[in-house]
């Protein structure tokens, strides 16, 4: 049902703990920003104290800044009102707060204390706090008032133990995502291990948290569980649990009602409930399409043309963010650039989440002692139906080795993009796609290399360029030697100072441009081999003539003609309902140079 390996395992470790008779049962942190300048923080706190009263107890809190210095505090008595007491600390304003974002995940620390009538501390709890806003503003998805592009992936929990993922493996996941320019993760299709949320808070990943609801086996028509109110309690219970469990995590910027479960009264009610309790995050649901119960149009696997058709509609007010796209199965992700040409040039098209992060396969040993990756069909009696390798559609292998197409994701998702606008003096136009980072946090390394692999020039530059701005950088004229037909300008960017997940030696972005050498004659270059003669176009490298004993053998110049075998995505319909046909395929783009 969830496009994941259907294996059993211990899903999580259960923590057991005891509390005093009177205890802190729940708390909700409200850490947002004022919406005039998005500079000052607004802090509020709601606390629920459970259990029978023990005299006049009190609840106090301290909020410490990222350096550990207290910046806010408060204390209120717990009035005896039965077995549950609700306490609200009034909102307070913090000037020029350190804001949280995926680029700069600044965290404050909240410490909550419950004291008995004698002033003795009986319980201490708390969490990390991030000041940020997440909203739909003028039809665009914004963090801290700034429109952002979702450079995302979907992530199932998978390891060689099944669905149980160790802390070390989660740390490896987030490190790889940060290294490969991913800024968003969708928890597909269920809330995940609590440690994953803490990692995303601390190291900076936007998170789409998703309720554990999927029933696409029932279809989207009249039989859909979404339309049967008998199932409302089940839908509502899973939505409640998702929200209450994770409501205090700043990394969660969008709630998702579920996945591929149809749409109807049950999802309308869960949407209504979430909007009633949640004022600081949008809510999305893919199967709602353009019905009222979604704040984001998040249809999966829409083509570039379908995105353009949506944007051409009148009076649209939802951003288009694909919850799944460019199915990363086998040799794949080749169409990513075409999507991002649209996202970078249309304000209300704001990215999406690749399906998906990790291959759900298992390492096995064959009869010859050699290891291999197993998948559906490798287990159980022969003839048992399976989905084959359909769950091997990750950007990384099951042991977290990056697949080649993760490099394509890194390149397209990179936040620094350059255009060569003057080949004579090597002037480069730099676009800063970061939302909250100046490019002076990075170093530009450049070099000019000839087609003989000799280094002709190199240097480093610091570029001052604000988020979403452009800057023109002139590197200087580099003369190519006469024996060099063409040179290559290589641009590479690294961090000036290391981040916890990204070192100063890691290339975060690169570009390459061809520099023409001295233009030679366009006359044909003749050559002979015995009684055979041929001519080659010096500009294009095309074979224009081939003669044998003076007789021309070519009717036309030879042109490149290539085709590829079918990929996993070409053949991925596992029921054979849509046989692959190649008769419609044509060359997308051709070019030639020598």
Where on the chain are the PLM-derived regions?
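Substrate-binding/catalytic cleft of secreted carbohydrate-active enzymes
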Residues: 171-177, 184-397
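Secreted/periplasmic carbohydrate-active enzymes, especially glycoside hydrolases
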Residues: 5-10, 15-199, 203-207, 238, ...
């Amino acid at each position: 049902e969830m496009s994941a390996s259907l294996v059993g395992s211990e899903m999580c470790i259960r923590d057991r703990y005891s509390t005093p008779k009177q205890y802190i049962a729940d708390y909700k942190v409200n850490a947002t920003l004022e919406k005039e300048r998005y500079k000052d923080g607004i802090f509020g706190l709601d606390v629920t104290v459970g259990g029978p009263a023990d005299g006049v107890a009190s609840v106090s809190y301290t909020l410490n800044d990222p350096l550990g210095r207290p910046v806010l505090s408060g204390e209120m008595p717990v009035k005896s009102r039965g077995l549950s007491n609700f306490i609200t600390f009034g909102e307070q304003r913090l000037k020029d707060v350190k804001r949280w974002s995926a680029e700069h995940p600044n965290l404050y620390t909240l410490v909550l204390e419950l004291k008995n009538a004698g002033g003795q501390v009986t319980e201490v709890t708390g969490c990390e706090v991030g000041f940020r806003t997440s909203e739909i503003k003028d039809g665009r998805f914004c963090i801290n008032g700034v429109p952002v592009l979702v450079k995302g992936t979907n992530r199932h929990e998978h390891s060689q133990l099944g669905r149980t993922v160790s802390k070390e493996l989660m740390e490896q996941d987030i490190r790889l995502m940060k290294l490969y320019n991913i800024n968003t993760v969708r928890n597909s299709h269920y809330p995940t291990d609590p440690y994953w949320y803490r990692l995303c808070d601390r190291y900076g990943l936007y998170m789409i948290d998703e309720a554990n609801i999927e029933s696409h086996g029932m279809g989207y028509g009249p039989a859909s569980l979404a339309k049967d109110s008998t199932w409302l309690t089940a839908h509502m219970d899973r939505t409640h649990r998702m929200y209450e469990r994770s409501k205090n995590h700043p990394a969660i910027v969008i709630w998702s009602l579920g996945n591929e479960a149809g749409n109807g009264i049950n999802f309308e009610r869960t949407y209504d409930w979430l909007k009633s309790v949640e004022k600081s995050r949008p809510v999305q649901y893919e199967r709602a399409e353009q019905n009222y119960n979604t704040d984001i149009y998040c249809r999966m696997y829409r083509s570039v043309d379908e995105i353009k058709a949506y944007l051409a509609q009148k009076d649209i007010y939802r951003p288009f963010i694909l919850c799944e796209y460019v199915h990363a199965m086998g040799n794949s992700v080749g169409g990513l650039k075409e999507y991002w040409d649209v996202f970078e040039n249309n304000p209300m098209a704001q990215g999406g989440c690749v399906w998906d992060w990790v291959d759900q396969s298992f390492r096995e040993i064959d009869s010859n002692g050699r290891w291999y990756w197993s998948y559906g069909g490798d287990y159980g009696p022969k003839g048992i139906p399976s989905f084959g390798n359909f769950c091997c559609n990750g950007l990384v292998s099951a042991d977290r080795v990056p697949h080649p197409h993760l490099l394509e994701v890194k390149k397209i998702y990179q936040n620094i993009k350059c255009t060569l606008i003057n080949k004579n003096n090597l002037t480069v136009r730099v676009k800063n796609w970061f939302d909250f980072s100046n490019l002076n946090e990075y170093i530009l390394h450049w070099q000019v290399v000839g087609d003989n692999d000799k280094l002709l020039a190199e240097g480093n530059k610091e570029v001052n360029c604000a988020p979403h701005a452009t800057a023109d950088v002139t590197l200087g004229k580099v003369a190519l030697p006469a024996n060099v037909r063409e040179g290559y300008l290589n641009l590479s960017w690294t961090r000036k100072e290391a981040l916890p997940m990204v070192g100063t030696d890691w290339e975060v972005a690169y570009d390459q441009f061809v520099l023409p050498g001295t233009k030679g004659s366009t006359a044909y270059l003749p050559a002979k081999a015995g009684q055979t003669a041929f001519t080659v176009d010096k500009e294009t490298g095309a074979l224009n003539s081939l003669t044998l004993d003076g007789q021309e053998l070519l009717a036309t110049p030879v042109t490149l003609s290539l085709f590829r075998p079918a990929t996993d995505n070409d053949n991925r319909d596992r029921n054979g309902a849509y046989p692959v046909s190649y008769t419609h395929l044509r060359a997308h783009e051709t070019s030639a140079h020598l």
